[in-house]
A protein has these predicted regions:
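Receiver (REC) domain active-site loop signature in two-component systems and cognate sites
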Residues: 61
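Active-site beta3 strand of CheY-like receiver
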Residues: 51-56
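C-terminal output helix
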Residues: 112-121
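Helix N-cap/capping motif at the beta->alpha junctions
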Residues: 36-45, 66
Length: 129
């Protein structure tokens, strides 16, 4: 199953610069329908009103971390099937394992580029058409 370039994507990060970088990388891949949120709580609020094809979230945010957002998404019957990629500087093995156990679909350690992001997305959705 290939990913749909028109699917809405939610980028969650507390740094506007990182949101812009991820938006630009997604645009390089061909995605235009990208929303953003500054933390997990704001992301959950947006997810209540719109069905996203993918959530890309940072791990370290306040007041709600990306890890906590992932756990909330997976616990929600309405949201639990939403694909989720964690993008973070947290490369510690225990964090990767915790995210996998919580149900993350893929995990990217910063820094990264468009090719890395696309490869990780293809691993979640299958190769692009």
């Amino acid at each position: 199953m290939a990913f749909d370039l028109s699917m809405p994507i939610l980028v969650v990060d507390d740094y506007n610069t990182m949101i812009r970088i991820i938006r630009n990388l997604l645009k390089q891949i061909g995605f235009e329908n990208v929303d953003d949120a500054s933390d997990g709580s704001a992301a959950l609020a947006k997810m209540q009103g719109k069905k996203y094809g993918l959530v890309i979230s940072d791990w370290n945010m306040e007041p709600m971390t990306g890890y906590d957002l992932l756990r909330e998404v997976r616990a929600s019957p309405e949201l639990s099937q939403t694909p989720f990629i964690m993008i973070t500087a947290e490369s510690k093995t225990e964090n990767v394992i915790a995210a996998k156990k919580a149900g993350v679909n893929n995990y990217i350690v910063k820094p990264f580029n468009a090719a890395t992001l696309k490869t990780k997305m293809e691993a979640v959705f299958g190769s692009a058409a």
